[in-house]
Amino acid sequence: MIQKKICMVGVFGTGKTSLVQQFVHSLFTDKYHSTVGVKIDRKQVDLGGTTVNLVLWDLAGREETEEIPTSYFRGSAGIFYVIDGTRRETFDQLFEIRESVQGTIGDVPSLVALNKKDLVDEWRLGQGDYNALLDKGIHTIGTSAKSGEGVEDAFLWIANATVNK
């Protein structure tokens, strides 16, 4: 069996933990609990006959002035960035975070989840923002940890990308 470590990265409160809980346990809670350090979950997925054990490292949300400990990224096969579509600043900080991560581990498969898609009335991102991601070659998937929309697609995409790298 293949094992792949995926790090969940983003600003605090974007829904990293909620996405992992929805994917691994089919659970969602409205209660916010800040992750301290790192929380590790596992889930096996079948990719067309290849079984992959995903080891999901849910890293504590980054504050504006904080750096993520580089040791957390050691052995990572992929990075799953999460931004909150209702909080513009999480999009604005993505590029800085991504640059820092790439400087630490190099160019590994990555994905940006545009999370909280269920809150469309509160969305603060537009087509120009989406195009900015595409222009940089960043793969994006809209997700909702609450409804589950796009969650499995996002995790299966990053799993496939790490296996086929």
What are these regions (language model features)?
Residues 1-165:
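TRAFAC-class small GTPase G-domain
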